[in-house]
Amino acid sequence: YSEGVEDETYLRGVQVVGKDGTVTFTSVVPGCYAGRWPHIHFEVFPDIGSITDATNAVLTSQIALSEEMANTVYKDSRYPDSATNMSQVTLETDNVFSDGVDMQMPKVSGSVAKGYTVTIDVPVDTSTEPTAAAAPGGAGGPGGVPGQ
């Protein structure tokens, strides 16, 4: 973590797309907090100079994680509360994904032992005017105890 956020429990990263329009992040499977389906937030900005101000985002969205992958990962003792939280939420009851998740569900391959690869295509028109709206939160909020 960068100076000043060493005690935070959320992950943040910034990437610039390559010439082919793709971006790659290496991360961990996030824990599942109460009331929310396991997910990853992301924002898209029209250019590198815009990334320091969230109101410049041309897209703010979330990626839902697969139930099979999450249930497998949450058997690990480093995710002590995630299995319970996951058992109490469905995609239909989640406050973001309940309106349909087809465009927010990535392809998943891999395993706990070898690691997972999660891929999703997100068409973006960078000429879109920023909407200055943040993604809705959940009952739990960002962070929390690592792995939970």
Report residues per predicted region.
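Extracellular low-complexity, Gly/Ser/Thr-rich intrinsically disordered linkers
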Residues: Q88-V89, T93-A134, Q148
